[in-house]
Amino acid sequence: MQVKRVKVFKIRNETEAVEDDFVAEEEPLEVRTCYDDCQTFAIIMRTPGNDKELVLGFLYSEGAIDTIDDVSSVSIKGDNVVEVRLNKPLKVKVREMIVNSSCGVCGRAFLYTLNILKCNTRVSRDVIFSLPEKLKENQEVFKITGGLHAAALFTTSGELNYLYEDVGRHNAVDKLIGRLLLERKIPASNYIMQVSGRLGYEIVSKGIKAGIPIICGISAPTSLAVDIAEEAGVTLIGFLRGNSFNIYTHKERVI
């Protein structure tokens, strides 16, 4: 269950009333990695659901795995524990912290993929204009709670392939990348990623590492996000609202 019913005091002008409302669930998820033995790799604050995709995407973004072939099995151990058995020793150090849902040091193992520079993917303005509304229409839990971020993957013709929601925008992107790993679609060189929030370094670096050539958001990018998108050959689009958007890098992909 991704929502929880709560009682709220609703204030309207000079009146107040007790009403039922719904809020998004947020719970800790322990990520265990196993080779010779098992150890806690991280604890992620997330919205329950699609935990397998979340953990795989997170491990990929952290540089702990390179492909799905590095993983022997993924096991759900109770409500809030996922155990990942690896085919080789862990590449990075175990995190000694809780990763909150907004993150702050995500993508620490990020290395951009040079093959994106050779990608000839193109998309029309009309398709770009259509993405925010398609994202909003398919955010089922957000419609109930108003409290979740989303990340979605679209084709260059505007067809929605996947959409994931989470209390943390970084988690939503990791779930998306985990799905791509499971379906062996990385690098995702023929797709567009649309996110519901701002475009910070962590979000953009995750998309770049997955080989996504066009990354869009409804809010602003940060300076570092612009820098890495430019260097990696990725088209970065911000302030995508209504009938306008800003292209910050590699305009040639938008026709």
UniProtKB/Swiss-Prot annotation:
GO cellular component: cytoplasm
Active site: C103 (cysteine persulfide intermediate)
Keyword Cytoplasm belongs to the record: yes
GO molecular function: sulfur carrier activity; sulfurtransferase activity
InterPro entries: Cytidine_deaminase-like, FdhD
Any single biological process term in GO: Mo-molybdopterin cofactor biosynthetic process
Highest taxon in the source lineage: Archaea
Signal peptide segment: none
Compartments it resides in: Cytoplasm
Keywords, in A-Z order: Cytoplasm, Molybdenum cofactor biosynthesis
Pfam families on file: FdhD-NarQ
Family to which the UniProt record says this protein belongs: Belongs to the FdhD family.
Known function: Required for formate dehydrogenase (FDH) activity. Acts as a sulfur carrier protein that transfers sulfur from IscS to the molybdenum cofactor prior to its insertion into FDH.
Protein name from the UniProt record: Sulfur carrier protein FdhD
Organism listed in the record: Sulfurisphaera tokodaii (strain DSM 16993 / JCM 10545 / NBRC 100140 / 7) (Sulfolobus tokodaii)
